[in-house]
């Protein structure tokens, strides 16, 4: 972990000290809500959340045009948030970054990064916040639902672009190492199973 020469109080109790040259900025100033609906039926196959990824739904009734036209259109690198039923403490992995363009139910939040921000950095940051159940405390209503209207009021930690790139590269590297280990263990288990 990098040690910086000087730190400042973030003003956020759970966050504590941050490097002096990092900023805290309102989410609404760096992320834009994606609201484009699929009214022209440009896309005919909706996507869904699955363990922190966005995948195409396996079973789709493409004749249900009315539901397809109400889906939001997301683009590659948009960030999707499942803000539904936050009061159920499941490990749902509510954050995903789109690897392709497509459509998804408008019940989810889709955001697009503006200048000076890496979508991969925001995804990692939001996944870290999700793992600590930070989003659970932001929901409203009986079923604790998070909306962009509520999300945009909060702040995001914003290091300079080069540091965002370094953070993403480090986390990508570590994630790949973990995935390699998992694959290795699965292969070993499979060999034991066959014997």
Predicted segments, located by residue:
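Non-catalytic DNA-recognition/assembly elements of restriction-modification systems
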Residues: 6-38, 153, 161-165, 173-180, ...
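A short glycine-rich beta-alpha junction/loop motif
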Residues: 6-10, 102-107, 140-165
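DNA target-recognition patches
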Residues: 7, 28-65
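Residue-level recognition of short, solvent-exposed, well-ordered loop/turn junctions
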Residues: 23, 57, 63, 69, ...
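A structural connector/turn signal
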Residues: 63, 68-69, 141, 153
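A short beta-sheet element
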Residues: 72-131, 147-148
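Short amphipathic alpha-helical coupling segments at ligand-binding clamshell hinges
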Residues: 121-125, 170, 181
């Amino acid at each position: 972990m990098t040690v910086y020469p000087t730190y400042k109080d973030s003003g956020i109790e759970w966050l504590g000290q941050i490097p002096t040259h990092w900023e805290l900025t309102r989410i609404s100033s760096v992320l834009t809500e994606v609201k484009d609906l699929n009214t022209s039926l440009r896309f005919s196959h909706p996507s869904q959340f699955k363990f922190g990824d966005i995948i195409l739904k396996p079973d789709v009734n493409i004749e249900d045009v009315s539901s397809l036209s109400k889906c939001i259109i997301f683009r590659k690198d948009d960030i999707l948030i499942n803000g539904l039923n936050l009061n159920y403490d499941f490990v749902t992995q509510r954050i995903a970054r789109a690897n392709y363009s497509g459509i998804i139910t408008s019940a989810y939040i889709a955001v697009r990064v503006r200048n000076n921000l890496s979508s991969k950095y925001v995804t990692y940051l939001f996944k870290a916040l999700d793992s600590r159940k930070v989003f659970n405390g932001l929901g409203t209503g009986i079923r604790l639902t998070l909306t962009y209207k509520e999300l945009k009021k909060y702040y995001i930690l914003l290091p300079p672009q080069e540091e965002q790139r370094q953070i993403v590269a480090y986390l990508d590297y570590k994630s790949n190492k973990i995935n390699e280990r998992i694959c290795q263990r699965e292969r070993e288990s499979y060999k034991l199973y066959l014997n």
